[in-house]
Amino acid sequence: MHSPPRDQAAIMLWKLVENVKYEDIYEDRHDGVPSHSSRLSQLGSVSQGPYSSAPPLSHTPSSDFQPPYFPPPYQPLPYHQSQDPYSHVNDPYSLNPLHQPQQHPWGQRQRQEVGSEAGSLLPQPRAALPQLSGLDPRRDYHSVRRPDVLLHSAHHGLDAGMGDSLSLHGLGHPGMEDVQSVEDANNSGMNLLDQSVIKKVPVPPKSVTSLMMNKDGFLGGMSVNTGEVFCSVPGRLSLLSSTSKYKVTVGEVQRRLSPPECLNASLLGGVLRRAKSKNGGRSLRERLEKIGLNLPAGRRKAANVTLLTSLVEGEAVHLARDFGYICETEFPAKAVSEYLNRQHTDPSDLHSRKNMLLATKQLCKEFTDLLAQDRTPIGNSRPSPILEPGIQSCLTHFSLITHGFGAPAICAALTALQNYLTEALKGMDKMFLNNTTNRHTSGEGPGSKTGDKEEKHRK
């Protein structure tokens, strides 16, 4: 206990202040309102008054009043207003300088908030505060203050020298580099979860499961059996009495997803005759991912949709085979050739017309032989190419966009044309014989000059 004041009036005023203080504290305790910071500010103003020589607040109260209890760090008295509230800035586990929502002014209100936050954080051990780590993704990055804001805030009401303590090197905060990297990542399009521990990994520009397949059968860096059956699809063009199913291989599905068509989930589901459902596209993508094929959502088709797009390769080849059979057996090549030959009965034109028919027949044969050497993969077959890569790539493009129907169909049509040319040449030979017979009967036989010229020209 300190010695009592000399002045009697000072003693009475001091006791009056003590009684008022304890009455207010007693009422606050009964009301359940914590008022530590407000009481401390009043005590600070009293201690700095003209009666600063009064003894500290260690007076023993009467039995009606309980001594006040101040939780740490306010327990050691007296309270000094000049205490540095920013001494914890260099603490890497403190979030106070980084989580102040206001930039300025740094007034009395912020000093009280800093004191209240420090009172709730300092008594706790650092091991119990894992959420304060700078590497934790649950931090509120949107309210984090940047270093430039901290540096500029030194000019708004801070004490002398306080700006130096808030510099980037003085903070030493392990989360500042993380905040910078997170903001840069957000600007570049990568998203991070703010309120979850799980982070989203940025998707590379080229997916690992690329749709292009090399010659060794490796798809997207992984070995895929392209001859494996993916599903069986009922035919679209068959009648009810002769419905057949066609096996769709993994290689065929890969060809539908690759250029030139690049089908999306909706069109691929139509090709595979999958029923429309709410989650049909997602289930199809999940099934394709199991075999190493990637079908991104929201994909746009690259080629125009035709009737051939809806056919699987087995049915398209079946259609081309039936078309070729009909062209071979049912095309009226003889009737067409006879009709056209009757329009060219001039004996002077027979020789030139026959030469044109022979040249056309030779050109069709060359073109048919080229198409017959096409080695585009169809179904589960992967024949070795025999043509040059330049021409083979063009034939492959045509075959892929027609699902294997194009080249066989053209060959079938050329077969019908070849049959017509053959019948036309036979008709031309008959016309030559008829003309020769007519010349013999008219005195223009082989012994005559005209007959000798025609015979020599025919040879």
UniProtKB/Swiss-Prot annotation:
Transmembrane segments: none annotated. Residues 299-429 are annotated as: H-S-H (helix-span-helix), dimerization. GO terms for biological process: aorta morphogenesis; collecting duct development; distal tubule development; ductus arteriosus closure; fat cell differentiation; forelimb morphogenesis; gene expression; glucose metabolic process. GO terms for molecular function: chromatin binding; DNA-binding transcription activator activity, RNA polymerase II-specific; DNA-binding transcription factor activity; DNA-binding transcription factor activity, RNA polymerase II-specific; protein heterodimerization activity; protein homodimerization activity; RNA polymerase II cis-regulatory region sequence-specific DNA binding; sequence-specific DNA binding. It is found in: Nucleus. The modification Phosphoserine is found at S258. Residues 30-139, 435-459 are annotated as: Disordered. Residues 121-132 have a biased composition (Low complexity). GO terms for cellular component: nucleus. Residues 450-459 have a biased composition (Basic and acidic residues). Induction: During retinoic acid-mediated differentiation. Up-regulated by starvation and a high fat diet. Residues 35-51 have a biased composition (Polar residues). Keywords: Activator, DNA-binding, Isopeptide bond, Nucleus, Phosphoprotein, Transcription, Transcription regulation, Ubl conjugation. Localizes to neurons in areas of the cerebral cortex, cerebellum and hypothalamus (at protein level). Sumoylated. Sumoylated on Lys-21; which inhibits transcriptional activity. There is a cross-link at K21 (Glycyl lysine isopeptide (Lys-Gly) (interchain with G-Cter in SUMO)). Pfam families: TF_AP-2. Belongs to the AP-2 family. Sequence-specific DNA-binding protein that interacts with inducible viral and cellular enhancer elements to regulate transcription of selected genes. AP-2 factors bind to the consensus sequence 5'-GCCNNNGGC-3' and activate genes involved in a large spectrum of important biological functions including proper eye, face, body wall, limb and neural tube development. They also suppress a number of genes including MCAM/MUC18, C/EBP alpha and MYC. AP-2-beta appears to be required for normal face and limb development and for proper terminal differentiation and function of renal tubular epithelia. Binds DNA as a dimer. Can form homodimers or heterodimers with other AP-2 family members. Interacts with CITED4. Interacts with UBE2I. Interacts with KCTD1; this interaction represses transcription activation. Interacts with CITED2 (via C-terminus); the interaction stimulates TFAP2B-transcriptional activity. This is Transcription factor AP-2-beta. It comes from Mus musculus.
